[in-house]
A protein has these predicted regions:
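Amphipathic, Lys/Arg- and hydrophobic-enriched alpha-helical face
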Residues: 21-40, 56-59, 124
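Short, aromatic/basic-enriched loop-to-helix "N-cap" motif that marks the start
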Residues: 58-74
Length: 170
């Protein structure tokens, strides 16, 4: 991580990223490990997540810790699933397997609760990956489809399609 910090030109952004690392590094590893069940793969997923976070520092809320954590955990989950898929390319993995892995890695549930505790948040919280992540990034973190595509390592069109399908499911 500290080698990646040297790539950040702005000292304020470098310090912000350092604080994020101090605050969330262990939790990021646990989220990735919960999905991957392998220490080396979890470390790879966290490292890939840091690269995405550094490239998108302007999207991370500096005032709202819950918003920042929501964004970070979404990136970590996405990168961990990408690592899992790369690791298991030979064997087909269905969406139920992914959902089971995500359920196991969810933790205390506070990650996905909005501060107002609205029923819409509860509905979204019950959705499966990737619908839940796209809706949270779009409406809670207020990201554009381009930013969502970058965060989830997918195309803009795919982010739009996922969002559309998710809204229909609501």
């Amino acid at each position: 991580m500290f080698q990646l910090l040297e790539l950040i030109e702005n000292e304020e952004d470098r310090e912000f990223c350092r604080k994020l690392s101090e605050q969330f590094d262990s939790a990021m590893y646990h989220v990735a490990y919960g999905i991957l069940k392998n220490s080396a793969d979890a470390e790879d997923a966290v490292q890939e997540s840091y690269i995405a976070i550094i490239n998108n520092l302007d999207k991370i809320s500096r005032e709202n810790c819950h918003k920042a954590w929501n964004y970070i955990v979404t990136i970590v989950r996405s990168r961990a699933i990408n690592v899992y898929r790369r690791r298991n390319r030979e064997s087909k993995m269905d969406e139920d397997t992914i959902e089971n892995l995500l359920q196991e890695s969810r933790g205390d549930g506070e990650i996905f609760e909005l501060p107002d505790g609205s029923s819409m948040s509860e509905l979204i919280g019950r959705m499966k990956y990737p619908y839940k992540d796209v809706l949270y990034l779009r409406y809670y973190n207020e990201l554009s489809y381009e930013e969502i595509a970058t965060a989830l390592d997918t195309t803009v069109d795919n982010a739009r399609h996922i969002s559309s399908r998710a809204r229909k499911k609501l």
